[in-house]
Amino acid sequence: MASSSIASFAPFESYSPPLNTSETSLISVQLTQDGLDYHGALAFLCGALLFGFVYSVFYNLYLSPIARVPGPLIAQVSPLWLMRAVCRKQLNCDIKKLHEKYGKKPERSPVVRLSPTEVSFATVEAQNAIHRPGASAKQGLFFTKEGTLEAMMGEIIWPATNLLTATVPEEHQRLKKALQPAFTEKALQLQEPIQQQHTDRLIRSVQEASRQNRVVDLTPHMSQAIWDIISDLSFGEPLLKDQLAKFERLKTTFCMVSPLLEALQVLLAVPGAQTLAKACVGLVPLLFWLPTNVLPSAQLRKRFERQDSNEDFLTAIMRCREMGIQMTDMELQSNASLLVMVGYDTTATSLSATMNLLLRHPLCLQALQDELHSHFSSTSDMTSKPLSQLPILNGCIQESLRLFPPANGKGTNRTSPGTMIDGVYIPRGVNVSADMYTIQRSPTYWSRPNEFCPDRWFDNGPGTEFAQDVRSSHNPFLLGPRMCIGRAVALQSMRMLIAKLVYTFDLEAVEDYSWDLHVANSYLWTGYRCNARV
């Protein structure tokens, strides 16, 4: 009875007919073969990967055309050295240390290896060879951006080719010719009222902030002023404040993914891998939206439709169309966006660096203030021409640009056409650069290279301490055909902002803050501040 009861409540089980012995053996053999096939495929894949890894290491160490270029072992066989440098946000300093190590005896090398496909030079000779068309250009060999990470990202991010991303020399020359009228001496004079307007607004902004708290971070005030100046010159009106915040967030994101981008840079040199590299960049959607999200095309169209007398970049550029120098609407948007983003970031960075250096060197700050007070009775008297003739003001700016070049990141990289650079043959396709940060701090070219010495720019005659400085090695705006087209605008804006700030306020440092120690640098300088007692 008990067994019957238990059986009646047993769970239902489907019926399966019994297998005979031959069927069982056949299934067992098949499962065994499937398992062997799976494990065999896995073993083959692992073996292939191991062989590929070993061969890659062996090739990069012994067979690569740049195998003799000295550098850390990890840099010779992988992108990990560069990935580490940008990840820890010490790219400039780390490259400089490499040059100091391998530039000494017995190596005495003008070039170091940063990755399996990238090398860095630290000599004026290399800088001229890479950026100035010379003997190699006469042979039809040009250093271009084709194959660089910047060019690859430019194709994906920007709506059309611009001055930064153009890889063909003729195309770059056409765009430069179309944009050049916006940066002539006459254009600068006509644009000055826009700079004056936003500089005066900066002074009022700092005055208001100092009423609430005597310690003021000057960086956001200076950054906003430069953003307003550059965007006003580019679009005929300042862009919204939230667009500046959006750009700063995107810049931070870009630097955060820089280690991944370094790995992709190595992929660019592998045949057939460029498509994969571009697809990987596409996985970072924020980078796609940079020009159109920060600088909407609707705002550009609105500027085209508006007829006014304000003199800005677009006024001069549109005049070129009348002379037959053509740019498409997409090229106009791409280049206008470029002028705002690059013009803003480099100028804002240099402003903050200069003010920080002045705060750290109160004697220099006092000398500058005395110079300004001796030449002007008020800030309303300050105009671009007399400011450009002040030795201490211009010395402070040039010295800041020497110590902290704003555009030293990957933007100076080029692809070798296969030629000699400073006595070293660099094969075609290798990524090359002349490291601006290292050159401008090299004892080979500068007396007291790591010190802030504004007087080196005006007190440098025969017999002086700085007489032997090689000032031709100072190229913060690059050199050659790709020299920054907006350098005069940037310098004019910096002179005006610094002069009015130093003239108006008695500034004093409130912390021991050093750019060398505290400011992150990967592809760009980020996270800087400038706290001062006002």
Swiss-Prot record:
Pathway(s) where this gene product acts: Secondary metabolite biosynthesis; terpenoid biosynthesis
Predominant location: membrane
Tagged with keyword Transmembrane helix: yes
Top-level taxon of origin: Eukaryota
Subcellular location(s) per record: Membrane
Family: Belongs to the cytochrome P450 family.
Full protein name: Cytochrome P450 monooxygenase btcB
Organism: Colletotrichum orbiculare (strain 104-T / ATCC 96160 / CBS 514.97 / LARS 414 / MAFF 240422) (Cucumber anthracnose fungus)
Biological classification of the source: Eukaryota, Fungi, Dikarya, Ascomycota, Pezizomycotina
